[in-house]
């Protein structure tokens, strides 16, 4: 494990307040992506400003950028069909972390959730913090809000981005291995874990 002090030598950090600062920075980075985008979030809501982030992922995939999106099975739930189709057609690879089965959260092994809010672009820049992909002035359960949410994220460059990228890649392949096991593709699951 890399010590925190090791990161301080080669990284730059910029504090972003709310989605009104985070989303434009995210979109700018994704629009400039050359090789890959890794994105993980608990909530991805496709209303308002969240739709702009989704559009940036689609544009990147259409340019040939490897685009991975992981959303939580409770926080996001099933993606809207229209967005699912658009992302699939564009080449955005989407995985749902621990989707709910017929028994929902009654089974304790379903309580583990993906609360990370991370995006790594080209292994060079990482966005992380407490902000979901959710318009600051809209709540899916309550509608329009009177005031924006108060939350923060950081944009960082340097070795911290590469470390986050490796961690996200590991989750991606673990999820693929679990999927392969469920589909009785054990040899492929073993290969996925070695990737």
Regions found by a protein language model. Give the residues of each.
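Charged, low-complexity intrinsically disordered terminal segments
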Residues: 1-195
């Amino acid at each position: 494990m890399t010590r925190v002090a090791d990161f301080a030598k080669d990284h730059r950090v910029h504090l972003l307040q709310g989605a009104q600062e985070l989303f434009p920075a995210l979109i700018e980075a994704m629009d400039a992506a050359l090789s890959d985008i890794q994105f993980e979030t608990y909530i991805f809501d496709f209303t308002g400003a969240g739709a702009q982030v989704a559009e940036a992922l689609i544009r990147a995939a259409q340019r040939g950028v490897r685009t991975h999106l992981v959303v939580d099975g409770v926080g996001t739930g099933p993606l809207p069909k229209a967005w699912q189709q658009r992302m699939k057609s564009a080449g955005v690879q989407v995985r749902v972390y621990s989707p709910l089965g017929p028994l929902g959260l009654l089974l304790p092994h379903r309580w583990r959730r993906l609360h990370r809010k991370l995006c790594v672009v080209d292994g060079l820049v990482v966005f992380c913090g407490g902000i979901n992909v959710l318009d600051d002035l809209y709540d899916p359960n309550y509608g329009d809000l009177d005031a924006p949410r108060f939350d923060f994220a950081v944009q960082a460059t340097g070795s911290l981005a590469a470390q986050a990228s490796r961690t996200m890649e590991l989750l991606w392949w673990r999820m693929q291995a679990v999927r392969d096991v469920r589909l009785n593709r054990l040899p492929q699951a073993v290969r996925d874990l070695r990737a």
